[in-house]
Amino acid sequence: MCIRDRSKAPLYVREAYECKKFAFVSDYVRLYALYSEGGIYLDTDVIVKKSFDNYLNNGFFSSIEYHKDMVKSLGIIKNDLNKDYTRKEYVEHIRGIGIQSAIFGGEKGNEFLKCCLDFYKDKVFIMQDGSYYDKVILPDILALCAEKYGFKYIEGQQSLGANVNIYPQEIFTGIKNATDNSVAIHCAHNSWRNKSFLQKTSIFLSQYSWGNKLKKILDIIGVR
């Protein structure tokens, strides 16, 4: 599968490509691949712990991505969500709550995947002031499109329309939230970000128990 002619891709994707912001191109391409061919998408830094067989009957599947510290510190539940955990109309997207985009699968031609692709149709990557439209990323886009099928911004399993199933965070998850129930774990190296040497060092240290004390020092001096 490939998009053979870049000129046929949405303007957002073409502009992101020209700006060499390839992570944002990848967001679209992974959706396009699953919609066109079906299958399971994994980032390159994902560890698969268990079989995906139990999830193959879904039209689309992934997990909730819920950053509870961010949600709490920003007052997201009070300020940005309705009482039924749907997004308030004036809020562009919900910070700290989305759908896991490093691990997901879908059937060829699934209407939810088509909805996600359509999100890009009227978007540009380069704004009028020269800045990039990069604040709304794929976990946000998946969540925004899932709203049409009944998605709510709350932890726990959700069975939605179009045979979309969103599982609890621990099933397809980041390394900090991994449990014995996890099927696949995203190590979240964030290779798409521009990192300083100290930031890269901090990430390296975090992989080893002996590096925890040194990493804490880096955290104190502002390296995240």
Give residue spans per PLM region.
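Glycosyltransferase-associated regions of secretory-pathway enzymes
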Residues: 4-27, 42-224
